[in-house]
């Protein structure tokens, strides 16, 4: 493959040799990557410097706020301590006998008496508020500084000063107008008198000549005074116009800044409301998914424990009653045996069967037969456990007790 080589010799230094290829272009000039890297380094360095400056400013502000907060916290603690001391001093004064002279209660509604009738927490709250007034004012001012309302307050003070200055300038303008009008009237009067004297120039007397000379001098002074009054009036009117313009601009700026501040506060309150709603929803989810099941399990467990304890107590009571019944039966049987052992010489009297005895024995036989059938039926059932109701348990216990007593009497 044939490749054409063209050597281009540039007049400027340094010399660059390029190789031309119809398909590929190779350049042996300076590398542009280093230039791009340097450019990006400069841009990033500028951004990094700006961000570092902002971070330093933020850190300084936070440090200043922390120092102010610590100072105000110390002041608040000192104020509360002073309030407690004053409260204790007031209580000591109220208990002092030297300060409680009341002429046998004839003097009513003394300040100390009213103060004693007030509640302690009300007096403490009043003293705390009085002591923390400076701290509250400082906290309010710090809040205004953070939200930017302090600048708006300064702007409002500037507007008030501009209004006062404009009011004073208007007074000066009115005075300058009066002086200017007075100067115009004085000059026009002197010119009118000069014209009258000039009309009868041929018949002047020495007095008229002196008067003309004086009027001529006064005319020059009046002209100068009029010119000065005019210049001063123009300056005051220009100042009034400037103050009016500045006042108008300041009022517009104030309304604009207050609108921005109110929008910022409204936006902050909206975000605060959303955050509170999110926190409430989070707490609701936590309570419903975590705490409520745990609480339910705990309640069920405690209820089961209480039921088990109640059943155990009932079982203990039943066992105690059965043991007492068995002890009573054993004691009766022991007494019966002792009686039979102590009286062996007595002859046994044959028992006479009566109809009532036969009926009682038949009932006992029926109950025993029913018990045997029931136990046999229970053994035939697939379940091995037997469940008694309270009434069935009581009837079964009564049957056993009566059977034991009957056997004891028979023996």
Swiss-Prot record:
Required for the maintenance of the structure of the mitochondrial inner membrane. Involved in mitochondrial morphology. Causes growth arrest when highly overexpressed. Keywords: Coiled coil, Membrane, Mitochondrion, Mitochondrion inner membrane, Transit peptide, Transmembrane, Transmembrane helix. It comes from Kluyveromyces lactis (strain ATCC 8585 / CBS 2359 / DSM 70799 / NBRC 1267 / NRRL Y-1140 / WM37) (Yeast). It is found in: Mitochondrion inner membrane. The keyword Coiled coil applies. This is Sensitive to high expression protein 9 homolog, mitochondrial. Residues 292-411 are mitochondrial intermembrane. Pfam families: She9_MDM33 (PF05546). InterPro entries: MDM33_fungi. Residues 69-103, 148-250 form a coiled coil.
